[in-house]
Amino acid sequence: MHTNKKYLHTSGDESVLKGYKPVIGLEIHAQIKSKSKLFSTSSTEFTNSMPNVNVTLFDASFPGTLPSLNEYCIRQAVKTGLAVGGKINLYSQFDRKHYFYPDLPLGYQITQQFYPLVSEGKLRIDIPQGDGTYKPKYIRIARIQVEQDSGKSVHDLDNTLIDLNRAGNPLMEIITYPDLNSSLEAELFVKKLQFMLRHIGTCDGNMEEGSLRCDVNVSVYNASAGDHPLSGTRCEVKNISSANNIPRAIDFEIKRHIELLTNGQKIEQQTRTFDAKKGETLLLRSKENIPDYKFFPDPDLPYVELTEDYVESVKTTIPSLPDDIVEKLTSEPYNLNFYDANILLTNNGGVEFFETILHDSRWSSKLNPKLVANWIASELMGLLNASEITLSDSPVSYIQIGSIVEAIQHEDISGKMAKKIIKIMFDEKSGEMALDIAEKNGWRQITDKNVIGELCDKIIAEHPTEVGNLRNGKENVFQFLVAQVIKLSKGNASPSLVNQILREKATNKPTTTD
């Protein structure tokens, strides 16, 4: 998963930390992908509907109405728990969390405070080290509990309007341990989880539509003084609705905490919100005003009891998981680098596109997996992203990409000409193969040794000083001479043959090949 390139993370910067270290935990609310709500038959659609059309009497809390559990939501939560390696609790229960808000008509939220459906999972993130390598880190997940969403309040200058379309929508609250130590790690975790949920089909992960929301808990401790990592006072930032705002909110909090502590002040336990325009967090309430939710088991709902057979049946519906796919791509026989493997994984259909190219029987020789992956991840995806087109709608087919790689491997075209060819494929959408385009434009690579020899002779004759320097051991001029030969061939001479033949002719020494 890729980080926000436009945002410079500061929570790993020692000049900012001043001996302190951050401790971060996340609470992520993911709307379960289900056609109907958690305890009613209403549709879960709320973004494209008129207000208050997907509301049953129970959703609106009419007296005498009772909840009826949607079993499919339990199945989806179990699937999520298994995907993160969690323990599926065969016994769980629903509890009431009491608080008043206009868009919560029941006066309480139905959640799983005491006995959640899932406990003790983990999710791996891969942290870039700045040198092209990645360091894996496992973030523990304390619990996944199933609960209902609230409605939506719309405010203007004079009124607050209530839309209950979202009220009762099924949520998974995914709570991590405080294992994260930077805003970068938090961003990586959320994006990895977002992709995982989409991949297994349990949440669409659309933060901009509110189906994935994040609360962050941030504290710092004085590592240079040997303080315990959990000795700091945490503050919670609620309802961050953009993956790119998560590191911004965290870094602001880290700086705020450190500034207070270095000035001799104490951190107050607070609940805050993030103002994306200002790039800062704002106080919502302090510890003294934290409500007592008066949790107790919901008397209208039975315990949720599962069997081992039920859990096993859910397990069979889980596709290959992202980490397993990356492991496959970075191992024999593919041996891709981590970056290219992730590009293929995170672009829908990318792995299938890659493997279809490699396994097609039309190629005269085996294609290099690394070269195929690079042409998809760098060249094709670069064109697609610039035009905001997905891989599934690519005007360049897998056969055309394969034809480019085959032509490069056979030295029929150069890498430079191949980039021109894929641009023509992309723009003209003609379906032509690489060699056809190369022939039409005079871009076939020159591999005739006699022709290349004549080009080398001409450059040697035109640059006697440089050739003399080369013969006297000044190797730095050799690449200059190579470039002149390539230029003379209009970019079509085989670089490997130019290197070999030019060196033989310029130094009067035959090159040896293994």
From Swiss-Prot:
Tell me which SMART domains the record gives: GatB_Yqey
Its predominant location is mitochondrion
Classify the source by domain of life: Eukaryota
Q: Which InterPro entries match?
A: Asn/Gln-tRNA_amidoTrfase_suB/E, Asn/Gln-tRNA_Trfase_suB/E_cat, Asn/Gln_amidotransferase, Asn/Gln_tRNA_amidoTrase-B-like, GatB, GatB_Yqey_C_2, Gln-tRNA_amidoTrfase_suB_CS, Gln_synth/guanido_kin_cat_dom
Which keywords does the record carry?
Answer: ATP-binding, Ligase, Mitochondrion, Nucleotide-binding, Protein biosynthesis
Subcellular location as annotated: Mitochondrion
Asked if the record carries the keyword Mitochondrion, the reply is yes
Q: Give, as one word, the top-level EC class.
A: ligase
GO terms classed as biological process: glutaminyl-tRNAGln biosynthesis via transamidation; mitochondrial translation
Which is one GO molecular function term here?
glutaminyl-tRNA synthase (glutamine-hydrolyzing) activity
**Record Pfam families:** GatB_N, GatB_Yqey
One GO cellular component from the entry?
glutamyl-tRNA(Gln) amidotransferase complex
Q: Which reaction does it catalyse?
A: L-glutamyl-tRNA(Gln) + L-glutamine + ATP + H2O = L-glutaminyl-tRNA(Gln) + L-glutamate + ADP + phosphate + H(+)
Task: Write the Enzyme Commission number(s) for this entry.
Answer: 6.3.5.-
**Tell me, how does this one assemble?**
Subunit of the heterotrimeric GatCAB amidotransferase (AdT) complex, composed of A, B and C subunits.
Q: What else is known?
A: This protein may be expected to contain an N-terminal transit peptide but none has been predicted.
- What HAMAP family does this protein's entry cite? GatB (MF_00121)
Family the UniProt entry places it in: Belongs to the GatB/GatE family. GatB subfamily.
Its biological purpose is as follows: Allows the formation of correctly charged Gln-tRNA(Gln) through the transamidation of misacylated Glu-tRNA(Gln) in the mitochondria. The reaction takes place in the presence of glutamine and ATP through an activated gamma-phospho-Glu-tRNA(Gln).
Q: What is this protein called?
A: Glutamyl-tRNA(Gln) amidotransferase subunit B, mitochondrial
